[in-house]
Amino acid sequence: MTQVAVVNVQPTKNFMEVAFNLIQYKEVKQGNIGLDKLYELVGCDSKMIERVTLGELPNGNYLDLIIDEEGTFGQWNRGIHIKNANNDKITVLGNCVFVQSTIEGDWIGWNSEEKMADAIRPYTYKIKFFELAEKEA
């Protein structure tokens, strides 16, 4: 079974419920991740995405964080701050997906949750979930 790690900010649930299930492991059939599968995983209708390369993995692939072009995947009020072991920081509003990027440019998942967690861990030393205050009318 091939899987990817999806950050799901779950806007319909309360803040504490989301914190315990923020990163979810999702199955990807056939191993290669196409755009349609990414949109399905994050519930996105915009069809415009951006890749943030977090670093090189021990297997020669790269760890990419896939977000929509506006950084939201349709969710404007919640997100994550990611800090890696070097204290580099990235802020993402909404849902996102961690994938491996091959030298050929394909996005692929992992065959083991343990290997996936080991690959992601150095680049996500600290993940902080946040919620923006709602605007007053």
Indicate where each model-derived feature is located.
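Short beta-rich binding modules
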Residues: M1-A137
